[in-house]
Swiss-Prot record:
Belongs to the transcriptional regulatory Rex family. This is Redox-sensing transcriptional repressor Rex. One of its GO terms (biological process) is response to redox state. One of its GO terms (molecular function) is DNA-binding transcription factor activity. The gene is rex. NAD(+) binds at G90, V91, G92, N93, L94, G95. Keywords: Cytoplasm, DNA-binding, NAD, Repressor, Transcription, Transcription regulation. Homodimer. It is found in: Cytoplasm. It comes from Oceanobacillus iheyensis (strain DSM 14371 / CIP 107618 / JCM 11309 / KCTC 3954 / HTE831).
Amino acid sequence: MEQNKIPQATAKRLPLYYRFINNLNQQGKKRVSSKELSEAVKVDSATIRRDFSYFGALGKKGYGYNVEYLLGFFKSTLDQHEITEVALIGVGNLGTAFLHYNFMKNNNIRITIAFDADENKVGTDIGGVPVYHIDELGERLKNTEVAILTIPADEADAIANQLVEHGVSGILNFTPARITVPSHIRVHHIDLAIELQSLVYFLKHYSLN
């Protein structure tokens, strides 16, 4: 099965598998079973075996999976050898936290440029990332395919349009707005308020006892 035909649910779990396998490799572990994987990443073992089956024979029955082989496979599949440069739009509290964190555990992802409208932030360097004025977006945004939005909701659509116009094809949207973009642009929405409300609702109405 071609990689672009892999179910999206499977594709979303691949970074989770990679992180755990990478940790095992750093610990010097040579092999791992689907049961061990299941307990660590909180995905049932049948789902893990099905996910892995899309890529052919990654393990052997009765032996499990070779950690070094799996690590090499996931590095290649997730393009860990290629650096993806990311732009951050909005250097407020959340944006600043992203700049300081800057995906240190992800070898292939780096925020390399940030934009904001606040003159007090423009021209500064936060976490090693230069901050430019939002009006410079078109001039400064070169060869960047991914952007993170941490701006007020009422600005999200206009900024998203500018990002698309200047070549961005993937947006991680932390604003409450559901931005409108062309069909060939991929947007992942993360609304922390909704996630928290959902958690509280499930705690009240779906007991795990």
